Amino acid sequence: MTMPYYASAEQIMRDRSELARKGIARGRSVVVLTFRDGVLFVAENPSTALHKVSELYDRLGFAAVGKYNEFENLRRAGIVHADMRGYSYDRRDVTGRSLANAYAQTLGTIFTEQPKPYEVEICVAEVGRVGSPKAPQLYRITYDGSIVDEQHFVVMGGTTEPIATAMRESYRADLDLEAAVGIAVNALRQGGAGEGEKRNVDVASLEVAVLDQSRPRRAFRRITGPALEQLIPAEPAPASEPAPESKPDTETKPADPQD
């Protein structure tokens, strides 16, 4: 007689968490940070048709890593949620916190009730109205529905630790757009596979957008083409290896044989 398969609830949750974390780590990294004029999104994304960064509503932006079809479903659902709330009440009632809470509830339900969790991690960003003293808001929502209110920047996907370390060392709150792009790109270059290994990050492999607080209604805009090329810092030249020092010839030649 065969025994029925049994796994504790703790083991099931642990297996689901491991599955989701591995799926997220396989993706390319995304950096979201606040700067002087709003919020900047910088994502490694060589595709020109599939976006990891997008607009949600007038003052809201969205970034995600993981399985594209899963976070694309979340993005579309977020847009519908925001449109319905803005139409039913007022456009000012659509906030980053309300969208982040809706995403957290959805991901938490999927994680606990569905056989397979979503392999995604998302960030919802918000900027205030023109002239508002309200600081930009960043909300990180993970695969299990956990939500974190981040203060300055968010790093998601890929090898996050070296990128987050580089951001902590170079981030300042008063950055302009060019400096913010430079810091984010240089941080992404630190996310190589090996220790100390740097990635080749250029314009063709980047998706960049901002939430510009100075824009009157729709704050989201993409930065592409020549405008992006002017902001990307040049790749540092590899250090040349020092030439080996020449050693003096101390060996004595054998004396000529005498006849």
From Swiss-Prot:
InterPro entries, per database record: Ntn_hydrolases_N (IPR029055), Proteasome_alpha (IPR050115), Proteasome_alpha-type (IPR023332), Proteasome_asu_bac (IPR022296), Proteasome_sua/b (IPR001353)
Subcellular location: Cytoplasm
Swiss-Prot/TrEMBL GO biological process terms: modification-dependent protein catabolic process; proteasomal protein catabolic process
GO cellular component assignments: cytoplasm; proteasome core complex, alpha-subunit complex
Keyword Cell membrane: no
Pathway terms, separated by semicolons: Protein degradation; proteasomal Pup-dependent pathway
Keyword hit for Cytoplasm: yes
Primary localization: cytoplasm
Pfam families named among the record's database cross-references: Proteasome (PF00227)
GO molecular function, one term: threonine-type endopeptidase activity
Comp. bias regions, Basic and acidic residues: 244-259
Superkingdom of source: Bacteria
Region called Disordered, residue ranges: 222-259
Activity control: The formation of the proteasomal ATPase ARC-20S proteasome complex, likely via the docking of the C-termini of ARC into the intersubunit pockets in the alpha-rings, may trigger opening of the gate for substrate entry. Interconversion between the open-gate and close-gate conformations leads to a dynamic regulation of the 20S proteasome proteolysis activity.
CDD domains documented for this protein: Ntn_hydrolase (cd01901)
Keyword vocabulary terms for this entry: Cytoplasm, Proteasome
Subunit structure comment from the entry: The 20S proteasome core is composed of 14 alpha and 14 beta subunits that assemble into four stacked heptameric rings, resulting in a barrel-shaped structure. The two inner rings, each composed of seven catalytic beta subunits, are sandwiched by two outer rings, each composed of seven alpha subunits. The catalytic chamber with the active sites is on the inside of the barrel. Has a gated structure, the ends of the cylinder being occluded by the N-termini of the alpha-subunits. Is capped by the proteasome-associated ATPase, ARC.
Role noted for this protein: Component of the proteasome core, a large protease complex with broad specificity involved in protein degradation.
Family indicated by similarity: Belongs to the peptidase T1A family.
HAMAP family (UniProt xref): Proteasome_A_B
Protein name from the UniProt record: Proteasome subunit alpha
Organism lineage string: Bacteria, Bacillati, Actinomycetota, Actinomycetes, Mycobacteriales
